[in-house]
Every structure is written in C-alpha cells, then in structure tokens.
Amino acid sequence: MAKQVVFDREAREALEKGITKLTEAVRVTLGPRGRNVVLEKKFGAPTITNDGVTIAKEVELEDPLENVGALLVREVASKTNDVAGDGTTTACVLAQAIVREGMKNVAAGANPMFMKRGIEKAVAAVVENLKAQARPVETKDSISQVASISANDPQIGALVADAMEKVGKDGVITVEESKGMETAVDVVEGMQFDRGYISPYMVTDNERMEAVLEEPYILITDKKITAVADLVPVLERVVRTGKPLLIICEDMEGEALATLVVNKIRGTFTCVAVKAPAFGDRRKAMLQDIAILTGGQVITEEAGLKLENTTLDMLGQARQVRVGKEETTIVEGRGKEEAIEARIAQIRREYEESTSDYDREKLQERLAKLAGGVAVIKVGAATETEMKEKKMRIEDALAATRAAVEEGIVPGGGTALVRAQTALDGVQAQGDELTGVRLVYRALEEPMRQIAANAGVDGSVVVEKVRQSGDSMGFNAATREYVNLFEAGIVDPLKVTRSALENAASIASLVLTTESLIADIPEEEPPVPGGGMPPM
C-alpha cells in the first residue's frame, strides 16, 4: 500500500488535530459534574460511559494523519490505565495541554529537543513535590472517599471500602454482574478452588447438594488413585479418630472410588474426594499452598513419599471444609502461622519479579487465598446498559483504591498539580529548556480548569483562588465551594496523579520532536458488482 509522507509544521499540526479531537471527546467526563459519552456498537445496545480509556479506545478518525495523533493519546490513556487503573481522562487532558502550548513555541522557533529536556526536568520536580504532599491511606473512611471520587458515587465508595475491609489489602476483589437490582458484596471466607466432589454420592446435605466436613483430616497428593490398597493404611488411621477425611488428588476412579462411596452410603465413614486445582506447575504450587494452610504435606513421589506410608501427622486439618458440585472451600486451616507468613512472602516476591500479567493475576489470587480472602461485588441495575456502566465505574474505583493504599493520597480536584507548580521555581533551566519547564507549569492547571468548566465555573478564577488559599484548600466542583479537601474527602491516589503526568509528558514530548509523519493513503473501495452472470 502506498504511503503519504508529510513534514515539519504540517506533520505536527495533523498530530495536534488528532490529539485535540480525541481529548475533546474525553474531557467532558472529568470531575463530579462531568457528562457521559455514548459509544455506538456494531451489535447490541450502545455503551454509556465516563471512563476515559474506554472512550479513547473507540475513537478512530477518518484522516489517517490525524488518526496517528489520536492513537498516541490512546496510548497515554491505556498506559495510565495499566499502571494505575484510573486517571485516564486527566492524562489525556495533560497531554493535550503540553502539546497545544508546545506547538506554539515550536512554530515560533524553539528547539524541540531542548524543550523535551525541560519537560523531563519539570516532571521529575513535580513528582517529588506530589510525593511530599501525599498522606497514607489507613482508615476505612479514607478508602471509601477515594472510591467515591473515582466512581462519582458514595454508594459505590462504601461498597468498595466494605469489600477491602473484609479481605484486606492482599485480598482479591472481583466484579460480576448480578441477576437482580441490588448491588452487594459477597465474601468467600477461607481458601476456595474451582473443583467439586468427584462423585455426587459423597454429599452430606442432599437438599443443597454439598458435603460439609467438620474438623476433617485432609490428604493432599498429586497422584491418581485407583487401587484401594494405597488408601487402606491411611483410612484405617483416620477411622480410628472418628473424623471425616477430604482427599485432594489428581483423580480417583475404579475400586478406590467405589470403596469410598459404599462406605459413605452405609454410614461407616465420611470421605470426600476432589480433583486437584489448576494444571502443571501451577497445580504443584497450589497443592503446596493448601498443605501449608492446613499444616499437612503434599504426598508426592518426587519428595519420596508414598500413599501407603502416610501417617496422621502428614495430613492437613481445618475447622470446616465445604465441597459443592464445582468448588471446594477450606475454612480456618490449622497450618502454622509462621509457615503461612513465609509462603505469603515468597509469593509476594514472585509477584514483584513476574513480568507476565496473567502470571501476576494468578499469583495475586494465590496470595489472596492464603492472606485475606476473596470478595465478589455483584452489580445490579435495571437495564444491561446501566449495569455495564456501573460495573466500569466500580472497576475504576477498585483500581484507584488499590493505588491509594499503595502510594497514598493527595488533594483531589486537580489541586495537587496546581500546588506542585511551586516546585518548578527551583528547576535549573535556561533558554528552550526553560520553555519546556513553562509548558509543564501551564499544563498543571489544565485538569482543574476542565473540572471547573464542566461545573459551569470559570477555570482561571478557580485556579487563582486555589493558588492563593491554604495547602489543603481546594475547589469542590460538586457544591461549587472552596473547602478543605482532605476533610471533605476529595482526594486522588498519588499513583494515579503521578502516572497521568508522567505518561502525558512522555507522549507530548515525542509529538513536539516529530519532524515527519508517514501514514497509509486510504484506498477507495471498488463499487460492489451487480447481481447476475458475469460477462462472457
């Protein structure tokens, strides 16, 4: 396909137009009085959202040169979303502000490479200032405030804070669609994995079709059990104690399964067998997690252990085990606290060193099962469109809350960025480098200006008033009043604000240093031929 090549001012102007078009679509959503954007779908109902990255991903411009600019801002939004999970609209607004002011200076003859260095120096100074402004998040109220601001809904804030309190900062919180109208939090206590009983004859509660074992012994092995002779020694030892037995194994069939089922039906002995969770190396790791949680050992020939030689002290124990058709939950494992803590520390190290998103997600799940638990927020709404919009806001709120717990919070409403302007006074720069610093200085006001504009107030007036007021004072766009932002609960996670600025400055610097642009020449679609026979 043939390419078109444009240079100099024409290239930069095309990029700026694309950036502006995408940012104009996104910026209307910023702040508590921000509006929604409707996204048309090829199939099904349209999506209504105020999530910056979701809107950015939908924008594709007709002009291929302008579309390159839009793609660059989309990259800003996506990167910020990946790192912090929120702040995507702020990132787009900051990027556009730096590009807009920078283009004027490049057109006036400023050197873009020196401006880029100035931008980098300014961003480093601002980030240090933001860190100094940050406060740690320690209370449930603080978590609720962060989530409420992100989702623009106090009810969602309370839900997220409730879920966080129940499972702890290492817990996993997932968001699912509910079948009803209510939005609620369900917490799974203990360790749960997605494997149920091997045979339905093993259930102890026929009405609910689940097996509930009180104070059971737990046999954990990676072996497939078919011969009953392998199990007899350990079964005899467990029967003497009068306690039930849970067997976690690769699979069970043949006479071993038949023997357990017959004994259960006769009422001689209660034993439930479930398949081991996951596959391959992840299965070995999860079996080891279960063993440490319950104070047992994994009976594996790799470690020189055989089923027929298993003793009671090799078995795990728990207060209760519930086994359903598709999941097993171990409640209050009897493992040693120090062993569990050591395992948690090991998984956390693996999580920090892992580069794969999938592996990190699975490690986070394992960490939650050992450390905290799993909470599920079930989202209810009157229509599917409303449910999807609400689900997106809850996911954003969750990401913002995790970011806040990680790095702390700063004053919200764009105030932290305006306060950070003072850090730029001490940046050592001259000439075009100083111009780059000034670009960032002006851009730091842009989120507050936009929040004020969306609330129907003059942005310049708001910025000036905030600049002259005390450290924690800022503009509450919801009530159009000037308040102490920490006391009013108007806060942003430091990680979100920092990531938005860093990613915006990175892309904006590259746009300003662009001197040529290469894009596809759109091909005209040939007309569709008419029906009938082709010509002879």
UniProtKB/Swiss-Prot annotation:
Keywords: ATP-binding, Chaperone, Cytoplasm, Isomerase, Nucleotide-binding. Its EC number is 5.6.1.7. GO terms for molecular function: ATP binding; ATP-dependent protein folding chaperone; isomerase activity; unfolded protein binding. Its main location: cytoplasm. It is an enzyme of class 5 (isomerase). It catalyses: ATP + H2O + a folded polypeptide = ADP + phosphate + an unfolded polypeptide. It holds the Pfam family Cpn60_TCP1. ATP binds at T29, L30, G31, P32, D86, G87, T88, T89, T90, G413, N476, A477, A478, D492. It is found in: Cytoplasm. GO terms for cellular component: cytoplasm. GO terms for biological process: protein refolding. InterPro entries: Chaperonin_Cpn60_CS, Cpn60/GroEL, Cpn60/GroEL/TCP-1, GroEL-like_apical_dom_sf, GROEL-like_equatorial_sf, TCP-1-like_intermed_sf. Together with its co-chaperonin GroES, plays an essential role in assisting protein folding. The GroEL-GroES system forms a nano-cage that allows encapsulation of the non-native substrate proteins and provides a physical environment optimized to promote and accelerate protein folding. HAMAP family: CH60. Belongs to the chaperonin (HSP60) family. Forms a cylinder of 14 subunits composed of two heptameric rings stacked back-to-back. Interacts with the co-chaperonin GroES. This is Chaperonin GroEL 2. It comes from Moorella thermoacetica (strain ATCC 39073 / JCM 9320).
